[in-house]
Amino acid sequence: MAKKSKQARAREFNEKSRKEIYYRDCGGCIFCAKGYRMEKATWLDKEILSVMHYIPRSKNGLGIPQNGALGCQYHHNMLDNGNEGVRGEMLEIFKEYLKSCYKDWNEEELVYSKWKF
């Protein structure tokens, strides 16, 4: 198996970050906690949880707690695919949530840069 680049590793959530996010988010989806658009979600959709990127990996979003939150399969899919035209609204909720967790939260610090020191 080929070794991942420094950039690829920086964009993934490591075990420590995943645990920090899990405990910060009380083990549940941040959108479910708000009751956001739950009408089509099945019980299984809500049971399967994963860490979502605020700034996606495809846009060099870092795998750090300040760029992630716990999401159920239903909401994670809705956020990633924007299939209901609510991606912008969800990103605003996500952003406000992260800002409430980190007083010095700065969106510019969530993107991988080879030249940051």
Where are these regions (language model features)?
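A boundary/linker detector
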Residues: 1-26, 33-48, 88-117
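Histidine-centered nuclease catalytic patch
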Residues: 31-70, 84-87
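Zinc-coordinating Cys/His ligand positions in small cysteine/histidine-rich zinc-finger domains
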Residues: 71-75
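Inner-leaflet juxtamembrane helices
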Residues: 76, 84-91
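Active-site hotspot residues in diverse enzymes, especially metal/ion-binding acidic/histidine motifs
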Residues: 80
